[in-house]
Regions:
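Ser/Thr-centric signal marking residues that sit
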Residues: 39, 56, 99, 107-108, ...
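Short glycine/serine/threonine-rich phosphate/pyrophosphate-binding segments
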Residues: 107-111, 215-218
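Hydrophobic alpha-helical segments
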Residues: 40, 84-88, 105, 109, ...
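Conserved phosphate- and dinucleotide-binding cores of soluble alpha/beta proteins
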Residues: 2-12, 16, 20-29, 34, ...
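HTH-adjacent hinge/linker in prokaryotic transcriptional regulators
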Residues: 2-27, 31-104, 112-116, 121, ...
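Generic secondary-structure boundary signal with a strong preference for alpha-helix termini
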Residues: 63, 70-71, 102, 109, ...
Length: 265
């Protein structure tokens, strides 16, 4: 029990050091904790499997910018009307019988709610999507598996990557944290980005779902550039159509239904 407690404390300490320095070496950690290189390498492998860091030659780097992470409940509460509109419009791009991938994230979860009555094969790394579609009779549901990342309710890591690389996907529907003006898409987690990139490569068509607020922002790790994405579905508040057209991405606009206000509210 004491060894297990010390091990957990070491995991926390490694992540604290990484958050401060952004990278660590096996040699430095060995000296800090007074344990063998084998032990430190096992620690780094354990943390990598859980999406906390990325192994490098002789050490590790931080997998995500924890200072910019937000709870999934907060993200789900942002721009709900826009996300619903985007999801409905994106569902019109799906043909019956297709194999589609639905990414993790609040907009992609909204997409899952709109396709419950369709006949499809759905591959996903999202717990929310799995729960949304688990009782849909026409949906053949397939999970990537992998290590669970609570911050995003998603599965990532080597197991998920291996699954994706063995599949052929007709259309993938992807979410993004960052969408820069020059058509670069990014997320807050390196290992998550690795999976996103693999999904896009495994797909005949890549569709990005992003509300207008994402435009002009950047995140920690790039997973796609304009040439990798076929279609961008966004909401009617998006006013950068010429910039997107210049990147070669097809732009699809979703009309957002006005919110009706009740008298006295």
């Amino acid at each position: 029990m004491e060894q297990e407690i010390y091990q957990n404390e070491r995991y926390k300490a490694i992540l604290t050091i990484l958050n401060r320095l952004k990278k660590v070496s096996v040699q430095d950690l060995t000296q800090r904790f007074g344990v063998s290189e084998v032990t430190i390498r096992k620690d780094l492998s354990f943390l990598e499997e859980r999406g906390k860091l990325v192994r490098t030659h002789g050490g590790a780097i931080l997998a995500e910018d924890e200072g910019r992470l937000r709870a999934i409940a907060i993200r789900q509460a942002e721009h709900p009307a826009e996300k619903t509109a985007i999801a409905r419009r994106a569902s019109q791009l799906i043909r019956s019988g297709e194999t589609v991938f639905i990414d993790a994230g609040s907009t992609c979860a909204a997409l899952a709610r709109t396709i419950r009555d369709m006949e499809l094969r759905v591959v996903t790394n999202s717990l929310d999507v799995l729960l949304e579609l688990v009782d849909s009779p026409g949906i053949s549901l397939f999970s990537t598996g992998g290590s669970f990342r609570p911050e995003a309710c998603s599965f990532i890591g080597p197991g998920a990557l291996e699954t994706i690389r063995s599949l052929q996907i007709d259309t993938c529907f992807m979410g993004t944290t960052g969408f820069s003006r020059d058509g670069v898409f990014s997320s807050q987690n390196v290992i998550e980005s690795q999976l996103k990139s693999a999904v896009i490569r495994a797909s005949r068509r890549a569709v990005m779902l992003a509300d207008h607020s994402k435009y002009g922002s950047t995140a920690f790790s790039v997973f796609a550039r304009a040439g990798d994405i076929d279609v961008l579905v966004t909401d009617s508040a998006f006013n950068h159509t010429e910039e997107v057209a210049a990147t070669g991405i097809e732009l699809v606009i979703a009309d957002v239904e006005p919110v009706l206000k009740v008298n006295g509210s």
